[in-house]
Amino acid sequence: KNKNYESHLNQLRKKLIKRKKAMAAFLKENLQNVATIHIDDGGYFLWIECQPQVDTMDIYREALRMHITIAPGKLFTLNNEFAHCFRINASFELTDARRALLSKLTRYIQKISV
């Protein structure tokens, strides 16, 4: 049983890494010039750093309307040093439907970044 379990975990890790890379590539392409996508080696979240004037609470509210969950940077600090950043879960498969929603969200981010 241990071999099957280890094999399952290895397959799952590979799948999640592939999804994270796909999401990062999508966001980099659609947010170039307005945000930096930070990718760490562990976990399945991406840290998005928008331009300093962007308040990611606005992005959070827009994302909620689209049923996309993000974590505004304000959740990760006691002051506003990360108010222009947000975290997004990249473990989901980038389906056509999810891609369409994320496209709308990235267009919104581009609009408020001007």
Predicted regions and their residues:
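Amphipathic alpha-helix from the class-I
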Residues: 1-11
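Surface-exposed helix-capping loop/turn segments at secondary-structure junctions
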Residues: 7, 27-37, 113-114
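Conserved glycine-rich beta-strand-loop-beta hairpin in the small C-terminal domain of fold type I
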Residues: 14-24, 36-49, 59
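Generic non-transmembrane alpha-helical segments
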Residues: 26-30, 58-68, 106-112
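Preference for bulky hydrophobic residues occupying beta-strand positions
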Residues: 27, 48, 88-90
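Conserved C-terminal alpha-helix-loop-beta "cap" of PLP-dependent enzymes
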Residues: 48-86
